[in-house]
Swiss-Prot record:
UniProt-recorded name of the protein: NADPH-dependent diflavin oxidoreductase 1
Function: NADPH-dependent reductase which is a central component of the cytosolic iron-sulfur (Fe-S) protein assembly (CIA) machinery. Transfers electrons from NADPH via its FAD and FMN prosthetic groups to the [2Fe-2S] cluster of the anamorsin/DRE2 homolog, another key component of the CIA machinery. In turn, this reduced cluster provides electrons for assembly of cytosolic iron-sulfur cluster proteins.
Highest rank taxon of the organism: Eukaryota
Coarse class of the protein's main subcellular location: cytoplasm
Cofactor: FAD; FMN
Residues reported in the UniProt entry to bind NADP(+): 456, 520-521, 528-532, 565
Limits of the Flavodoxin-like domain: 5-149
Keyword annotations from UniProtKB, A to Z: Cytoplasm, FAD, Flavoprotein, FMN, NADP, Oxidoreductase
Pfam families, A to Z: FAD_binding_1, Flavodoxin_1, NAD_binding_1
Compartments (UniProt record): Cytoplasm
Skewed-composition ranges (Low complexity): 581-604
Residues reported to bind FMN: 11-16, 58-61, 131
């Protein structure tokens, strides 16, 4: 039997590819022969001929499919496609997302509905992997993958001699054949080359904007892009865009990792070839030849948190039976609570785990299976190219924290990366690329806006203010700026009210019409004050802007409670004003129709009962019109 299927992944950060490759390798263990393909290379005309097709994709922006998938998605949206186009095709969809976003897995949901509408038959439920889960996306990925395999085995039964019990102990082949020059007799000097997808910006300013003794270190970063011409076209950006920064691992941890695995820094990797090109792609973000040192410093995400598959694969490379048993337990269904306590809560990285299993003997080629590449980190740009055409500004929080159990002190990878430049002035190249976000100013500067950006969430709104300042200074009529309300939040007025002079100057100049700052630790009697309290105090003004003047409402900042609380405050404002309008209408009707009191009272009760549905419909309309926009992380 020809046991084939096609797995299509659509990725921007690399996560979808990683998940799709793991799924492909798992299917091979069950005698299924998947064809793995990047959606960029997929011929859309093949889709109606697929017997079984599996999509793995994330959601980007405000509910859009990833950029590489847009040509295929636009093709699928053609209205003239017959309703039976995929009559012979079964499909499965796994979405990777973050439930802190209102558009959680929208791309997967839309694709699922569209494939059904043109005749496709779903193999199983849509998978919705959530990065906010205690176990991250792994929880749903593992669960959904097993359901998928069970469904596929009803279509492609196992051969009679197949022993399913062997799968548990079976080691997958490594992804790559790797050629290494371990001798380097000629002492070749291999210079690390930044991947071709990135511009080489130069660090120009790295300035702390919180007071020195304050617990939070927030930095104003300026990157010089005046000489960025690597991609044949000059680098360009707009207000609201996102800069992706490719960081490096700390030198101390790099040397520790190399010593831990018995490698040598000057070994040279000359070639990396996929063993099975049907299920493995060549590594991206990697230019060869490369030394072991640069591979570990610039490619492997050794400071990242291991996923479940890492523990499963590592169990094959320990010689100590007790260590092996522990790793097997961590990778089992029964061991997930213990794994969460050991790994996710303590934020262990790959080095931490490897040090705790000293009997490891890892074949070098399996490192690419065990440790993923460093992913570029996104930062909202906090400048406007109209005012700063040769620089990009970032507002970066140096992320340091202690873990809940062992109280280990941690610093995020990109935080360490930017911090390292303080003492390393000779190596100030920062690899970046720019991506458009879903947050844009209205087309007309006269349309009013409401901006809510506590902490480093203010970055995108600083870029908005700079753009408004440019138009005010370069306009024939200085009075054409619409209202702009800015709600900023921080902990202390004297410690972390960054960009204070700039924001207050913008208020004086009329760039913004209202500035409300909530200091969560400066409240009277120890009471905390948050931005949503100021928003609710401005209920009438916000309603006027949203309802009567077609204004825009933006939220930017850390995911978690803040975006949810601010959204709830907006919903409360919408509800109270809709009720107020409804009551006013009923009162007018009562005055004009004194003989119909009973009917009016009944209508009033019905409206009050349906108010939540009315509010939700109103809010959904704001989202559809892209007048309610969130940028959270």
């Amino acid at each position: 039997m020809n046991k084939k299927c096609t797995i299509i992944y659509a990725t921007e950060s690399g996560t979808s590819q990683e998940v799709a490759e793991k799924l492909s390798r798992d299917l091979v263990l069950y005698e299924i022969k998947p064809r793995l393909i990047d959606v960029t290379n997929y011929n859309k005309l093949e889709l109606p001929m697929e017997k079984i097709v599996i999509f793995v994709l994330s959601t980007t922006g405000h509910g859009e499919v990833p950029d590489p998938m847009k040509p295929l998605w636009n093709f699928l949206l053609i209205k003239s496609l017959p309703s039976n186009s995929l009559a012979n095709t079964k499909f499965a969809i796994l979405g990777l997302g973050d439930s802190s976003y209102t558009t959680y897995n929208f791309a997967a949901k839309k694709l699922y509905q569209r494939l059904q509408s043109i005749g496709g038959t779903p193999l199983l439920r849509r998978g919705d992997a959530d990065d906010q889960h205690d176990l991250g996306i792994d929880y749903e990925v593992e669960k959904w993958s097993q359901e998928l395999i069970s469904k596929l085995l009803t279509i492609y039964p196992l051969s009679p001699n197949f022993n399913i019990n062997n799968i548990k102990n079976q080691l997958n082949k490594s992804k790559y054949n790797i050629k290494i020059d371990k001798i380097n007799e000629n002492n070749k000097e291999i210079k690390y080359e930044i991947p071709t997808q990135f511009y080489k910006s130069k660090l120009k300013v790295n300035k702390r904007i919180t007071v020195e003794e304050w617990e939070q270190d927030v930095r104003h970063i300026e990157l010089d892009i005046s000489e960025c011409k690597e991609l044949q076209v000059p680098i360009k950006y707009q207000s609201g865009d996102v800069a992706y920064v490719l960081p490096k691992n700390p030198i101390k941890r790099v040397n520790e990792f190399i010593e831990l695995l018995g490698l040598h820094s000057n070994w040279i990797i000359e070639s990396i070839e996929p063993i099975d090109k049907e299920i493995t792609q060549s590594p991206t973000l990697l230019k060869l030849p490369i030394t072991i040192y640069d591979l570990v410093r610039c490619y492997f995400d050794i400071m990242g948190s291991p996923r479940r598959y890492f523990f499963e694969l590592l169990s094959h490379f320990v010689t100590n039976p007790i260590e092996k048993e522990r790793l097997e337990f961590f990778s089992s269904t029964e061991g997930q609570d213990d794994l969460r306590t050991y790994n996710q809560k303590e934020k262990r990285n790959y080095i931490d785990v490897l040090k705790e299993f000293p009997s490891i003997e890892i074949p070098f080629e399996y490192l690419f299976d065990l440790i993923p590449p460093i992913k570029p980190r996104p930062f909202s740009i906090s400048s406007s190219s109209l005012l700063n055409p040769n620089t990009i500004h970032l507002t970066v929080g140096i992320n340091t924290y202690t873990t809940p159990f062992r109280r280990l002190f941690r610093t995020g990878l990109c935080s360490q990366y930017f911090s390292s430049f303080l003492n390393d002035n000779d190596n100030n190249i920062v690899p970046i690329f720019i991506k458009e976000s879903g947050a844009r100013l209205p087309k007309s500067n006269e349309i009013p806006i409401i901006m809510v950006g506590p902490g480093t969430g203010c970055a995108i709104f600083r870029s908005f203010m700079q753009e408004r300042l440019y138009f005010k200074n370069n306009s024939d009529n200085n009075n054409k700026l619409g209202d702009a309300l800015f709600y900023f939040g921080c902990r202390s007025e004297s410690k972390d009210y960054y960009y204070r002079d700039e924001f207050e100057s913008n208020l004086e100049k009329g760039i913004i019409s209202k500035l409300s700052v909530a200091f969560s630790r400066d409240g009277k009697d120890g009471k905390k004050v948050y931005v949503q309290q100021y928003i609710e105090n401005d209920s009438d003004l916000i309603w006027d802007i949203i309802n009567n003047r077609n204004g825009y409402f933006y939220i930017s900042g850390s995911s978690g409670r803040m975006p949810k609380d601010v959204k709830q405050s907006l919903l409360t404002i919408i509800k109270s004003n809709l009720l107020k309008n409804n009551n006013n209408n009923n009162n007018n009707n009562n005055n004009n129709n004194n003989n119909n009191n009973n009917n009016n009272n009944n209508n009033n009760n019905d409206d009050e009962n349906n108010i939540d549905e009315i509010v939700n419909n109103y809010f959904e309309k704001l989202e559809v019109e892209k007048r309610f926009i969130t940028e959270t992380w």
